[in-house]
Amino acid sequence: MRRVIAQGTFDILHPGHVHYLSDAASLGDELHVIIARGENVTHKPKPILDGRQRRDMVAALDVVDEAHLGHVEDIFVPIEEIDPDVIVLGYDQHHDEDGIKAALDARGIDCEVTRATPRELRHDDELLSTGRIIDRIVERRC
């Protein structure tokens, strides 16, 4: 059984998230998704929804076998527990593949690290980013 991990914030689910997770699921038999805890999100604004809500939404997607909240102090703990064959990064996630691979190697975790493919726009006004969705909400509702 080939075990795959995808990870992210997943605040306000959108078609880009669904594509990422579907792409990741296609690379194995079992997809585990690690949901970043709000306190660990440092590269962009903190999530609007709490971790449990984001985890439950991701878990409801058919392609996801299990959704996990990330560890409060050490983002690699869930990876060690799941013991994946491959970690799939989002095509535009800020993580450095080589840096992740080096950190995994240092912990004795032997798995492939790859990137998901980008999702092509299907409509001119399609939004594939939580930030752009929030901008549109502010523009139209405030």
Curated annotation (Swiss-Prot):
Catalytic activity: FMN + ATP + H(+) = FAD + diphosphate
Residues the record lists as binding ATP: 9-10, 14-17, 92
GO molecular function, one term: FMN adenylyltransferase activity
Pathway: Cofactor biosynthesis; FAD biosynthesis; FAD from FMN: step 1/1
Keywords assigned by UniProt, alphabetized: ATP-binding, FAD, Flavoprotein, FMN, Nucleotide-binding, Nucleotidyltransferase, Transferase
InterPro entries linked: Archaeal_FAD_synthase (IPR050385), Cyt_trans-like (IPR004821), FAD_synth_RibL (IPR024902), Rossmann-like_a/b/a_fold (IPR014729)
UniProt EC number: 2.7.7.2
Entry-linked HAMAP family: FAD_synth_arch
Function: Catalyzes the transfer of the AMP portion of ATP to flavin mononucleotide (FMN) to produce flavin adenine dinucleotide (FAD) coenzyme.
Full protein name: FAD synthase
Organism: Haloferax volcanii (strain ATCC 29605 / DSM 3757 / JCM 8879 / NBRC 14742 / NCIMB 2012 / VKM B-1768 / DS2)
